[in-house]
Amino acid sequence: MRAWRYNAAMTQPISRFPVPRLDELPEDIRARILAVEEKAGFIPNVFMVLAHRPDEFRAFFAYHDALMLKEGRLSKGEREMIVVATSAANECHSCVIAHGALVRVYEKQPLLADQVATNYRKADITPRQRAMLDFAMKVALRSAEIEEADFARLREHGFSDEDGWDIAGIAAFFGMSNRIANATGMRPNDEFYLMGRVPRAR
């Protein structure tokens, strides 16, 4: 079985903590990781890093899926835009790179993720998406200042209060994820850098 201590280039460790081998993992976690590999063509390092703590792995991805895979007014691309903007504010290299790739894939705009990460206010986004990211950034950086006027602005752009909860939940969840990634020294896969920029190899 493969060892995942190092990234694809085999030059830097993907975590400062021990990274388990696939054959050491509980069956449910191994099955999930292999399913991701089948779909993506590689195993994102976040799965192997978090698998160091199986119970927390399960809890993390259960909440992740509840936020990111649910039906609602937020598209998959918009959810990922929230992750990229707030992760950039939290200076999480791993999350910006990995989720920036998903923004490019879902939105089919190769420049958008970089724009959102560096200054979403100047990105090629709609007024609705600007309002969404303004709210997400306030949750990420100044949540104690959130008031009814913030929800009123979301409503002006067609969001419901439940959508506001979704935006807040994503910003808050990935605030935790950013900090875990930074504390563990998690590195993004090399594959993420080119996703959505060049055609996927067949």
Regions found by a protein language model. Give the residues of each.
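Hydrophobic alpha-helical segments
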Residues: 2-202
